């Protein structure tokens, strides 16, 4: 009674106490209570207690359901019968509700069935038991019907802590009882008030995708009951669910596919098509129309392969789907978008025609089908284009409404791409251009209402990748039209995006040189209109300079003046610091096309404009500057060094401006943001310049080493990584590179001597082990014989179970690279050193990896951990299997059975003998599933494997 009263008091506090602190405390207490062994009896008692209020009933039913799902193994052997009896009594007690309580009890019984083999329920398993209960207690049928509904749903509920073998067995038990379950449902149809509930249960059983013959379902009373309900007003939601599941059932390979289900298809499809008139009925309830649209979309998605053949009968479905697409409500129309995409793939992908054999036959059939469907896709272009038009009240749209509108536009853009792939981009462009002319004519040929024109320009933007660069009929007129648009922000923004999207066309156009100045003026206008428009214009400027760089070489001074005005805010430009980087990149691409002498002068001007503000700042107190005041200029250096592909010119500039870089390094090594920006600029300078930067690299590395030991900035590591990539194999750099990596790694290993320290510095761990992998690849001769190598392996072992995704991935990748050393460095002395380090640690590494698979790391990391274990096993073969056997033997048999561990070890042994990786993946997933099936088991496994207990050893390097 004490626990029961405590639960009631906590629930009362949770729902009724005015103090938030008290409510939070009560909620936490109740959550903790649900995990206790006492929760079984307390929840059961309170559910049977007639004085319990609704809040108590809901909480206790959820608790009991959760306990059965997750903690069934807590109960002593033989508890099943008593638990089943109690749950059955509760199901009867709540057969009329409350619905939430009845549902939770039903799920609890279904979860019990997942745990307990069919034989324990008596002959025929739970279905026969359920049938008998319904016969003996017909007054409780509604409660039992809900149980019958949730049973197949629980087959795929991974909250239930069942072993994989038992879960598969349960699915087989249910599918073998499909006929009996449908028989029970058919009998319940006679009770008219239960019809909706019966149909929902039928839909649930159909989701098992069991191969019931189409001839059987075609004349089944449950199917006919669902079809007859389609004509009800309002439409029966349960009947729609049944018909939807029947459609999916007929297309499922496990049901024999469309050919085997033809009798059923011939019954349901005509019934669905007969609903087409309702799509045009404005008096019809919107939810009913949505349900009808869903059925048409299901038919299209499920039978797309048949429809794509182009035969006459399926074309009726295509015309019906066009009608759904035409519906004014976007939520209804968009249901068909997936069909149009799937059909496009079926019509264009070569795999769809592989059975035809010869290329000639494939081409003939492909053209025949495309010809058949082109009218439908032409209609599609007209039907979706208007949906991207800004609403009249667009200025009053909330943030969420504007976000939804943008999502609508991108969804329509995808449909237009599908149409362009069927019709050809040039044909689609012509259709859209005609719409543009119509829109212009309707508004008096001067775009008084800008919204229709903007919508069509957006559509033209969407298909840009599919319009030929030699298209000469429409695009010249579109580009001419852009020059006469009114200065409206959204319209100009879309015009700028369109210019950027068609930059390749601009470059290929015969009149490119004469068009470009007017195009640049459009972009300049965009930069001064609004921030969003300026962002689009800057992006378009980048694309235009990228693709038209040769034609723009002679305009560098003009482009530079535009750039200067934009970054200084002159001319009313509204380009943000971030968007200005697009302009930097744009000019960098043009400079790349200049001859070296001219490029040096151009780059010098650009770098001077970036360096001047930094030098002015250096005259003041750099330490007091806000990071953004510096990084905005340093980032421009980074983009110039990255995109100007003149190594000698870039080297000259980094050498010239190294003095200001050095000053910033020394003044703000504590400032992560500034250091990241500075290291990024140096990284691109190193990458582009290569050996031309050799005079500066030594001092750069000295700065990195010195400041890293003081301030531990991760960016110093990734800059070092770039240096290793470029200079790692250069003998003249060997001395200071060896000093660099030993200094950096020695300091890093001192920072990360426990998992707690790795967790506190995930960025350092990430960049450290990325650098280590680079060293293995580019300078193994400096790294592997180094005394720091074994210390770094120890550090990696410490950090394997770090929860930070990128850090964990870098650590595991580094270890995998060591195990796979022969793939990149096949030198015996290095392999011997590697073995001397790994073999003494092999058992511990294997134990940590298996612990990671079994729950020490999230299941999303399974692939990365598996690959590390795979590499270890392929290198050390049976020795690795022995390590794994030793680790697996630590796991208690209550958590992992002998059979389950044997399967895993056998798969690992097969890998040692050269088997394919797929043979291991399945068993890894099984091991992971079993060991994570509930919190108790997971904690038991981790306590046995002790992934944080490292047993580190000191081994000789050679």
Swiss-Prot record:
Keyword Protein transport in the entry? The reply is yes
Q: Where is the Importin N-terminal domain?
A: 26-93
- Please give one Gene Ontology molecular function term for this protein: small GTPase binding
Any one GO cellular component localisation term in the record: nucleus
Q: Which InterPro entries match?
A: ARM-like, ARM-type_fold, Exportin-1/Importin-b-like, Importin-beta_N, Importin_beta-like_NTR
Q: What is its main location?
A: nucleus
Query: Where is the protein localized?
Result: Nucleus
Q: Which Gene3D superfamilies match?
A: Leucine-rich Repeat Variant
The annotated consequence of gene deletion is: Semi-dwarf phenotype.
Q: What does this protein do?
A: Functions as a nuclear import receptor for serine-arginine rich (SR) proteins. Regulates nuclear import of SR proteins that are required for proper splicing of the two resistance (R) genes SNC1 and RPS4, a crucial step for their functions in plant immunity.
Family, as annotated: Belongs to the importin beta family.
- Spell out the PANTHER family in the cross-references: IMPORTIN-13 (PTHR12363:SF33), TRANSPORTIN 3 AND IMPORTIN 13 (PTHR12363)
Q: What is this protein called?
A: Transportin MOS14
Its source organism is Arabidopsis thaliana
Please name the gene that encodes this protein.
Answer: MOS14
């Amino acid at each position: 009674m004490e626990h029961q009263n405590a639960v009631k008091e906590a629930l009362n506090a949770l729902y009724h106490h005015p103090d938030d602190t008290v409510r939070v405390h009560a909620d936490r207490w109740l959550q903790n209570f649900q995990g206790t062994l006492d929760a079984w009896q307390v929840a059961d008692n309170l559910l049977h207690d007639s004085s319990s209020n609704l809040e108590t009933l809901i909480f206790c039913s959820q608790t009991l359901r959760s306990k059965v799902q997750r903690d069934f193994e807590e109960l002593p052997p033989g508890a099943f019968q008593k638990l089943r009896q109690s749950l059955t009594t509760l199901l009867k007690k709540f057969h009329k509700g409350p619905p939430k309580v009845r549902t939770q009890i039903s799920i609890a019984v279904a979860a019990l069935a997942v745990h307990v083999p069919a034989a324990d329920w008596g002959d025929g398993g739970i279905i026969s038991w359920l049938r008998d209960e319904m016969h003996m207690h017909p007054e409780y049928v509604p409660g039992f019907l809900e149980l019958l509904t949730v049973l197949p749903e629980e087959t795929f509920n991974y909250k239930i802590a069942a072993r994989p073998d038992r879960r598969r067995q349960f699915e087989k038990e249910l599918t073998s009882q499909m006929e009996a379950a449908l028989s029970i449902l058919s009998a319940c149809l006679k009770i008219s008030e239960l019809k909706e509930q019966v149909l929902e249960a039928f839909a649930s059983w159909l989701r098992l995708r069991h191969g019931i013959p189409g001839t059987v379902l075609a004349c089944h009373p449950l199917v006919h009951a669902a079809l007859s309900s389609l004509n009800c007003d309002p439409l029966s939601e349960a009947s729609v669910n049944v018909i939807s599941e029947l459609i999916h059932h007929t297309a499922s390979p496990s049901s024999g596919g469309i050919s085997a289900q033809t009798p059923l298809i011939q019954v349901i499809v005509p019934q669905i098509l007969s609903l087409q008139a309702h799509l045009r009925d404005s008096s019809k309830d919107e939810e009913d129309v949505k349900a009808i649209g869903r059925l048409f979309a299901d038919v299209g998605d499920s039978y797309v392969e048949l429809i794509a053949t182009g035969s006459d009968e399926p074309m009726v479905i295509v015309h019906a789907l066009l009608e759904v697409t035409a519906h004014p409500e976007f939520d209804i129309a968009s249901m068909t978008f997936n069909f149009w995409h799937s059909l496009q793939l079926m019509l264009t992908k070569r795999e769809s025609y592989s059975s035809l054999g010869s290329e000639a036959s494939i081409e003939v059939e492909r053209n025949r089908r495309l010809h058949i469907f082109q009218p439908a896709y032409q209609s599609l272009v007209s039907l979706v284009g208007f949906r991207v038009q800004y609403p009249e009240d667009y200025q009053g749209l909330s943030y969420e409404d504007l976000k939804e509108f943008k999502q609508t536009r991108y969804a329509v853009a995808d449909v237009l791409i599908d149409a362009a792939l069927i019709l050809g981009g040039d044909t689609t462009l012509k259709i859209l251009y005609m719409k543009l002319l119509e829109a212009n004519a309707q508004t008096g040929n001067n775009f008084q209402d800008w919204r229709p024109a903007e919508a069509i320009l957006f559509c033209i933007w969407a298909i840009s990748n599919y319009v030929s660069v030699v298209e000469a009929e429409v695009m010249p007129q579109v580009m001419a039209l852009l020059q006469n648009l009114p200065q409206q922000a959204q319209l100009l923004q879309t015009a700028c995006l369109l210019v950027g999207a068609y930059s390749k066309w601009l470059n290929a156009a015969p009149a490119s040189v004469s068009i470009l100045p007017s195009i640049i003026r459009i972009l300049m206008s965009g930069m001064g209109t609004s921030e969003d428009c300026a962002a689009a214009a800057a992006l378009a400027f980048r694309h235009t300079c990228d693709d038209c760089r040769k034609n723009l070489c002679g305009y560098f001074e003009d482009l530079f003046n535009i750039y200067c005005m934009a970054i200084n805010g002159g001319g009313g430009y509204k380009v943000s610091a971030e968007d200005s980087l697009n302009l930097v990149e744009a000019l960098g691409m043009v400079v790349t096309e200049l001859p070296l002498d001219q490029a040096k002068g151009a780059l010098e001007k650009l770098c001077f404009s970036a360096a001047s503000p930094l030098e002015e700042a250096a005259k003041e107190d750099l330490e007091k500057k806000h990071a953004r005041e510096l990084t905005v200029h340093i980032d421009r250096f980074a983009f110039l060094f990255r995109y100007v592909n003149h190594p000698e010119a870039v080297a000259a500039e980094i050498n010239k401006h190294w003095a200001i870089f050095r000053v910033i390094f020394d003044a703000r090594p504590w400032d992560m943001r500034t250091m990241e920006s500075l290291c990024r600029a140096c990284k691109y300078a190193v990458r582009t310049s290569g050996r031309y930067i050799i005079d500066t690299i030594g001092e750069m590395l000295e700065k990195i080493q010195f400041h890293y030991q003081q301030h531990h900035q991760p960016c110093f590591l990734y800059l070092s990584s770039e240096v290793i990539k470029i200079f790692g194999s250069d003998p003249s750099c060997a001395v200071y590179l060896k000093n660099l990596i030993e200094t950096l790694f020695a300091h890093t290993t001192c920072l990360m001597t426990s998992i707690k320290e790795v967790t506190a510095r995930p960025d350092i761990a990430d960049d450290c082990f990325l650098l280590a992998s680079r060293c293995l690849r580019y300078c193994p001769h400096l790294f592997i014989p180094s005394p720091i190598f074994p210390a770094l392996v120890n550090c990696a072992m410490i950090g394997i179970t770090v929860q930070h995704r990128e850090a964990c991935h870098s650590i595991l990748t580094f270890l995998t690279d060591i195990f796979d050393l022969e793939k990149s460095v096949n030198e015996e002395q290095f392999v011997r050193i590697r073995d001397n380090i790994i073999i003494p640690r092999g058992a511990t590494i294997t134990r940590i990896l298996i612990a990671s698979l079994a729950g020490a790391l999230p299941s999303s990391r399974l692939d990365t951990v598996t690959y590390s274990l795979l590499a270890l096993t392929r290198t050390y073969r049976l020795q690795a299997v022995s390590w794994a056997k030793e680790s697996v033997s630590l796991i208690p048999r209550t958590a992992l059975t002998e059979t389950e561990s044997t399967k895993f070890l056998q798969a690992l042994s097969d890998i040692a003998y050269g088997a394919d990786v797929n043979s291991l993946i399945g068993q890894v997933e099984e091991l992971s599933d079993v060991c994570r099936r509930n919190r108790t088991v997971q904690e038991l496994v981790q306590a046995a494997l002790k992934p944080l207990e490292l047993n580190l050893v000191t081994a000789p390097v050679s």
